[in-house]
């Protein structure tokens, strides 16, 4: 039986990518971002290590959903107090905090453990077209989430 390949932590140099969420389908965009965060697109991928890259998402306010999700999809949060459940539709949350929609979708696709929480910190989401990470020299990554486009 072969041993699992473990890359040394010194050989891991994460890249920075910029993704434009304008008119991208939410779920398809989130799956591709989650794969980049985990490092599954690299040949040195190891399930128990952080081999992923940083992802900057811009124009989160322009992300698209299909069907009636804009009015029927509900986001819930709880304050921890009795009766503290708050619900909000996709449209209301998009107008109030558009970054949270993409963060919520990607977070659900990452592992639910310490590694997943560390991977989530590599995701940077911004509502508008500007971001403060120019010093990292991020590469523009074009993701095709619409079939045939």
From Swiss-Prot:
Gene this chain is encoded by: rplM
GO molecular function: mRNA binding; structural constituent of ribosome
Oligomer status and interactors: Part of the 50S ribosomal subunit.
GO biological process assignments: negative regulation of translation; translation
Cellular component GO terms held in the UniProt record: cytosolic large ribosomal subunit
Function of the protein: This protein is one of the early assembly proteins of the 50S ribosomal subunit, although it is not seen to bind rRNA by itself. It is important during the early stages of 50S assembly.
Family: Belongs to the universal ribosomal protein uL13 family.
Keyword terms: Ribonucleoprotein, Ribosomal protein
The protein, known as: Large ribosomal subunit protein uL13
